[in-house]
Amino acid sequence: MNQLFVQTEKIVDPREGKLQVVSNVDVCTKIAEFLESTLGPYGMDKLFAGKEIVVTNDGATILKHMNIRHPVGRLLVALSESQDSEVGDGTTSVVILTTEILSCLKPLIKDNFDLGCIKGCLEELRMMCIEHLEKMGMELDDEVLYKLAGTCITSKNIRHEKEYFSRMIVDAVKQAKIDDAESIGVKKVQGGSIGDSVAVNGIAFEKCFTYAGYEQQPKRILNPRILCLNVELEWKSERDNAEIRVGGVEEYQRVVDAEWAIIRRKLDEIISSGANVVLSSLSIGDYATQYFAKHGIFCAGRVSKEDLGRVVGSCGGSILGATDYLEGSLGACALFEERQLGKFRYNYFEGGGTSACTMILRGPGQEVLEEIGRSVHDAVCVVRTALRTRKVVTGGGSVEMELSRIIREKSMKYDDKRMFVAKAVGQAFEKIPLLLARNFGLDTISTIQDLRKRHANGDSCEGISIDGARDMQKLGIYEPLEVKKNMVKASFSAAASIIMIDSTIMAEKSQ
């Protein structure tokens, strides 16, 4: 398997200088070769078999599970993870482009080109590419936004439900706060088909552990008043080595009565507050559950802090550590309801002007669900990025081919060694459309020649589709401008950093 070559690469390399640089480029090339078949709508998946089964074509996830030990290889892993955290997409492209720049520069490095000159030229070309990318940017509207989400989904395992997921994701991001990552929650429920996935206008989470009396509690409440606590509403054992000395039965009874009085006081304070939905991150025991049921109150204990925080963020109120002062601490929404979802039960908090949204993903197996989750995460990040910057560019390798043309033209204006560096980088940018053509099953040589000719004639939106070179704007294939800018910046910076590494020193592990 290809990844084994990476894992068995020697970590301690005695070579220095140009030989070390060439060795590092070779390591990067081996890693990129493993990713190449995953690029684009017809990209293949990778299966990782270990303690858990992972099936994915997401670049960052693949690199994470490859267990790469080579230090330079780990730089590529960090590069992909950075792209994922910054803009959420382009994790495969950024590694492939970085590696191809290095591969095209490799003959120059072997011919003893000055590395400082190469680095300086890369910086100059990077700034030029960013400047031209800004000029390529197009204004975003709602129609383009849905198409942009569909473009991101096309290469994922939810592509057969592209229109449905595109609308669901765009509507969810529009409803939520763009800069609040927690305003969109994702829950994965095994069972059903991918098309059974839904977006909830509010918060939803799986029913927590319940005690006797839960069955008598209301499961649907209009305009609920929600109290969120970090309080334990049940008796608990004393701490280790705790001791209570009593002089008789009457004194022991007073201790028991005091315990009853404390928990009753807490429950009465909650009831007096007017709350009819009580959530706590700690347990709510039998007595409290039955007491609430008698007063028509729904309660749930051991709610995760993440879900409790999202309820507060969406419905208002605050998480309290005591029941003494509850006035003004209640949240509200339009509807609370507990519903059956497959073989699970879920608590829903909907409406009421909430800006939060929860996407409930369905799928036939855990591995499929995890990949759906990664696909939705990427699409959400892409839509968020586009809404934040309001600029998009065409996809399908059209941007890379146009930048390749611009860089090649720039190379003709140099009258020194920078001409060869620019030509090499221009060639490297053709790698993305070439791989798209290969993964589509097209004749790569004739397709790239055709695409190169179209761009030379001024058709800057021409990219690769299943039918060959086509106008990506007419096909509705878009990507956020920020994704391309981040990819270009990261690729140039990473390539410049790697070619300047002339030796590897293994530091001792810290004690």
From Swiss-Prot:
One of its GO terms (molecular function) is unfolded protein binding. Molecular chaperone; assists the folding of proteins upon ATP hydrolysis. It comes from Encephalitozoon cuniculi (strain GB-M1). Belongs to the TCP-1 chaperonin family. Component of the T-complex protein 1 (TCP1) complex. The gene is CCT7. Pfam families: Cpn60_TCP1. Its main location: cytoplasm. This is T-complex protein 1 subunit eta. One of its GO terms (cellular component) is chaperonin-containing T-complex. PANTHER family: CHAPERONIN. Transmembrane segments: none annotated. The keyword Transport does not apply. InterPro entries: Chap_CCT_eta, Chaperone_TCP-1, Chaperonin_TCP-1_CS, Cpn60/GroEL/TCP-1, GroEL-like_apical_dom_sf, GROEL-like_equatorial_sf, TCP-1-like_intermed_sf. It is found in: Cytoplasm. Keywords: ATP-binding, Chaperone, Cytoplasm, Nucleotide-binding.
